[in-house]
């Protein structure tokens, strides 16, 4: 007898064929039929799948301890969840990240996969839900409205660690370049005009310090995500959850994951609240803005090679033109800029979705999840790419940078304490009009002795605070 390719399952809307070997069930199949939207599936985010497995594991254990769920069924659910945490069955989470229903399809996808695997563990066949039901057992004392946000909050926390790691590595790369370039003199600029001298090391250390602030900012906002509303069920009132479940489930979730979670003090308030997502997304946006600005600087400093600033050399990664021979473009900073634009756009979508909540639930949470996970993933990837394919290989055109400083009118600023602002202005104007150097004009007009002028224009003296004697 040939093996059947499908099994038939039923729900509120009737019967539906499900692939016989699938661990998901009828409601996941409906979601697959309904939402062919983004081509981004839940299975593309392993951390998301792991997080929801932990939530279901904690709920099953808490329900068993409270006498609500049969211990044999609970143990099978916990074992199935552990297998998912260990990386199994991730291909059984095919639902589109973009969906209606406030995340119900995600929740039921998890419930069905866990139930069917638990059935096998107990010696039953997939779909024999009288022994372990996706709704009655795996989803016991839960609603999508508490299990779904608790899962993606934990997902964001897990992903944030990877964001911070990639950021820390990038900062270390900038610091290494700061040390490498500490004695290289270059011209600083404000408003794209020559300002005063600095070192390339100061510039790259500034990049590192600028980004360092974002680690603390990400951590501050990630803490907000560790408040969960498990036990609130549908709208936060706790209907169908026994007393003590909310507290115990949160404790077990903390134990299983190794992260400290807190039960929200007001579950009715917490159920529709999206404030933590808005804050965390804004932290990602702030990081993106800083990264993009740094990449703007890198592209400008690398401009040339003959007709631009040509201060630094970026590692050549690809031929730059199909028509212009020999052209090499700053492709890694460029792709970083574009990722940052996407993160900024995602944050705008998060803000609109957060504002769109109504009454006791915000049904727009799926797009919030998709946007934040995409922002985290893209930032991780692009920061690693920027570090390994750009920053680590940057070199400085030392002689060219020094020649620009030596020939710059901007160095006249260092003479203000010696000859005064008015005289310095006259020298600067004459240098600009005649093309002569500031150095020669100061000596010609007898404004300073050569010895004093050499001291005042000493490169090291010009790049830091120092005492001066008129």
Show where each model-derived region lies:
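Conserved, well-structured ligand/cofactor-binding cores
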Residues: 1-470
